[in-house]
């Protein structure tokens, strides 16, 4: 099932009109769209109905190749809410990027100890995302050397999982407020990754996430913290420069640390937000977790967009 939603201007998540198009979503070139467009789709994948939004920006040209960002909502969130507060609509419009917002199973992703029914039922979310990428690539003009993953909280853990288990697909990853919750995959080859984390995050603590795993998983598996996660990725990417991350930029409200001399020309970065909590998206009307309004989404995009396969 496909619903075509026309995005009103300014591009802030408002939806002005819905069409009644209903076509087979497995056939390429399925619709002649008016841009910008927000397309709401569902199809059966592995016996389950899976849904997503696709933002096709004003600058989309089927004769050119466009980057793709897979943008994953957090636990108990959904694709529509995340479209409205993640600000990747701005990135899409300013850079002619296609952004897809998948919907997690029961509003969750299977990404390690966090979180919800997707984890409990062993949902193959990596498989779902890879099939979704194949579908989008068949229907739109995608630069397959510039596919990126992003997300928030449980969606950030899923972003890490995709970077770890599908490093042959993704050129880079960048997300907010969670870590890699699995061991390095045998198939992993280094790609670049940036994580953004608020020092005042009470849901996924900056220092270590034991309280989070105890709450969400009734376990003490949450040994990960923001700096340790950065160090772990540095080791996975065989980064040079010693065990302690280098501080590259430092301001009153945030800093950027990590490694910039790693295998395959990759980098691993951590953005520490001194006054932010769990949802540090800019100009956020849903949450007030980024009080100094650091443009975290732009930081993530500028980092990811440097890299291609």
Where are these regions (language model features)?
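Serine-hydrolase catalytic machinery in alpha/beta-hydrolase-like enzymes
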Residues: 39, 43-53, 59, 63-148, ...
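Short alpha-helix in the alpha/beta-hydrolase fold that links the catalytic acid
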Residues: 84-85, 206-214, 222-235, 245, ...
């Amino acid at each position: 099932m496909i619903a075509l939603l026309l995005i009103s201007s300014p591009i802030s998540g408002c939806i002005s009109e819905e069409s009644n198009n209903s076509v087979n979503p497995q056939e390429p070139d399925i619709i002649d769209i008016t841009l910008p467009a927000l397309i709401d789709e569902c199809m059966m994948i592995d016996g389950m109905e899976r849904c997503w939004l696709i933002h096709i920006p004003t600058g989309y040209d089927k004769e050119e190749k466009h980057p793709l960002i897979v943008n994953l909502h957090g636990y108990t969130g959904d694709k529509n809410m995340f479209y409205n507060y993640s600000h990747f609509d701005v990135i899409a419009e300013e850079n002619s990027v296609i952004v897809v917002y998948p919907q997690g199973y029961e509003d969750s992703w299977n990404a390690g100890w966090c979180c919800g029914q997707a984890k409990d039922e062993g949902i193959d979310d990596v498989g779902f995302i890879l099939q979704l990428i194949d579908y989008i690539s068949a229907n739109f003009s995608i630069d397959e050397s510039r596919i990126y993953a992003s997300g928030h909280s449980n969606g950030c853990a899923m972003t890490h999982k995709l970077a770890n288990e599908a490093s042959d697909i993704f050129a880079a990853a960048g997300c907010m407020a969670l870590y890699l919750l699995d061991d390095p995959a045998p198939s992993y080859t280094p790609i670049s990754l940036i994580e953004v984390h608020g020092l005042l995050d009470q849901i996924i603590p900056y220092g270590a996430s034991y309280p989070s795993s105890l709450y969400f998983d009734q376990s003490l598996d949450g040994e990960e913290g923001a700096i340790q996660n950065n160090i772990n990725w540095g080791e996975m990417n065989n980064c040079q420069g010693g065990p302690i991350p280098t501080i590259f930029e430092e301001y009153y409200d945030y800093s950027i640390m990590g490694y910039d001399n790693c295998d395959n020309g990759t980098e691993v970065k951590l953005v520490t937000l001194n006054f932010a909590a769990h949802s540090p998206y800019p100009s956020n009307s849903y949450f007030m977790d980024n009080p100094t309004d650091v443009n975290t989404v732009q930081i993530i995009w500028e980092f990811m967009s440097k890299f291609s396969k």
